[in-house]
Amino acid sequence: MVYYPELLVWVSQEPFAYKEMEGGLIKGRLPVPKEVNRKKMEETGAASLTPPGSREFTSPATSYLHPF
C-alpha cells in the first residue's frame, strides 16, 4: 500500500450525505434510445465483414498478409 499525504479523500457511510443530493443520480442518467444501440450494432457488424475475394478463416487484423 502506498500512502500519499497530499491526497485527501472524504468517505461518507451514508448513501446520500445531503437531502438535496437525493435522487441526483437518477435524474442524471438518461435512457439510451434503441435506435442508437441498433446503429452501433450495425456499425460493428459491418466492420467485421470480410472483404470480397478474401479468405474467411483469416482474421481482419491479418487480412493484409497474402501468400506468394
Curated annotation (Swiss-Prot):
Give the highest taxon in the source lineage.
Eukaryota
Q: In which tissues is it expressed?
A: Expressed in brain and fetal lung.
InterPro entries assigned to the protein according to its UniProt record, in alphabetical order = Neuronal_3.1
Q: Mind telling me what this protein is named?
A: Neuronal regeneration-related protein
Purpose = May have roles in cellular differentiation. Ectopic expression induces differentiation of fibroblast into myofibroblast and myofibroblast ameboid migration. Increases retinoic-acid regulation of lipid-droplet biogenesis. May also have neural functions. Promotes axonal regeneration and augments motility of gliomas. Down-regulates the expression of TGFB1 and TGFB2 but not of TGFB3. May play a role in the regulation of alveolar generation.
Subunit comment: Interacts with FLNA. Interacts with the latency-associated peptides (LAP) of TGFB1 and TGFB2; the interaction results in a decrease in TGFB autoinduction.
| GO terms for cellular component | cytoplasm
Annotated keywords: Cytoplasm, Phosphoprotein
Q: Does the keyword Phosphoprotein apply?
A: yes
